[in-house]
Amino acid sequence: ENASKDVSYTIFCSGKSYAERSNFYKGALLKYIPLEANGIQSIFYDMLSLIKATRKSDVILILGVSGCVFLPIYRLFSKKKLIINIDGLEHRRDKWGKWTRRFLKFSEKMAIKHSDVVVTDNKGIQDYVTEEYGKESVLIEYGGDHVICDVGEEEKEVLERFCLKKETYSLALCRIEPENNVEMILKAFSESNEILAFIGNWHNSEFGERMQKVYGGSANIRLLAPIYDLKVLNVLRSDCKYYLHGHSAGGTNPSLVEAMYFGKPIFAFDV
């Protein structure tokens, strides 16, 4: 569906992420920033996006807090309404070092202090914001019904493409990072005869490349590249025997919520 005709939307995207750049998506204007949206560059990516958005926007929605360290300065020259979805508790992630965690905690504090509206995606994060900062937030939880679609005759073709049979395999889907317990899952399946289909960005990091090299040759493990086709994901989710969720940090994970909608048994870390 297209964005509302009553509201003009501008979305800022990383110019580093797309070989082909569209100017519009479902009625929204797309603008590109020549920086990565993740890692250290995300701070400057957020700052530049915010400055550009200020010129013609009445309301600005910020997703994540890494660039919010800039907000005290921003508030000196702009009173535009800021809505900030803080996502998860980035400063608690194991992958960050001490100084990065301190920076992210400070940036989170600035986000909540200088925002007009704070959005949280689950009750736990909402309670954290209230207890830590004494500020109320708007709870907007993830839905999962958007993943259901009519696959028609594609079910058989999808399973054959990935050498899978209905309800004989387990499925995992995540960013390939150590804190998602990727290696633990792969090691466990490599020592069994159970079939695993694991969808992720295996070539975006040294860790992912190493996992691909170590476990990619296992006869019972399928390491699949990222899949964005909802029909293909629908088949893989609805036909799996179990769903595995190894995340150990972060906020509500959309892929978990989506998987729950299919009613399959879920093995989740530390739950």
Predicted segments with their positions:
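Conserved donor-binding/catalytic core segment of Leloir-type glycosyltransferases
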Residues: 159-180, 186-199
